[in-house]
């Protein structure tokens, strides 16, 4: 029915209503292209985006490879907690 693997992934994502999980990491990876962050002040301003990109990647890995629901929930909660903590520390550092 679908011609390419990308089309299968795209239509499967629409069916699950999680299309943002497909496009959001790709958007953040474009923002993190070398040479884009050429100044250290700009690096600190984009630090939350880098942390969000890392959090999305770790969440996908945990959802794919950990099959025990309680451990999966604990790890995902820990990642979100650490993400919020690190972003708040970064904001306090900028003040």
From Swiss-Prot:
TM regions (residue ranges): 20-40, 42-62, 75-95
Domain of life: Eukaryota
InterPro entries linked: SQR/QFR_C/D
Cofactor binding: number and manner: The heme is bound between the two transmembrane subunits.
Source organism: Porphyra purpurea
Mitochondrial matrix side: 1-19, 63-74
Subcellular location: Mitochondrion inner membrane
Assembly description: Part of an enzyme complex containing four subunits: a flavoprotein, an iron-sulfur protein, plus two membrane-anchoring proteins.
Name of the protein: Succinate dehydrogenase membrane anchor subunit
Annotated binding of heme, by residue: 53
Record-level GO cellular component terms: mitochondrial inner membrane
Taxonomic lineage of the native organism: Eukaryota, Rhodophyta, Bangiophyceae, Bangiales, Bangiaceae
Membrane topology qualifier: Multi-pass membrane protein
Stretches in topological domain Mitochondrial intermembrane: 41
Pathway(s) of this molecule: Carbohydrate metabolism; tricarboxylic acid cycle
Cofactor(s) needed: heme
Main location: mitochondrion
Gene Ontology terms, MF aspect: metal ion binding
């Amino acid at each position: 029915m679908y011609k390419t693997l990308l089309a299968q992934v795209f239509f499967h994502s629409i069916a699950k209503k999680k299309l943002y999980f497909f496009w959001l990491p790709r958007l953040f990876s474009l923002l993190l292209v070398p040479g884009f962050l050429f100044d250290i002040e700009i690096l600190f301003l984009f630090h939350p985006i880098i942390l969000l990109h890392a959090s999305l990647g770790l969440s996908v890995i945990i959802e794919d490879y950990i099959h025990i629901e309680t451990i999966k929930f604990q790890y995902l909660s820990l990642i979100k907690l650490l993400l919020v903590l690190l972003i708040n520390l970064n904001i306090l550092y900028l003040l």
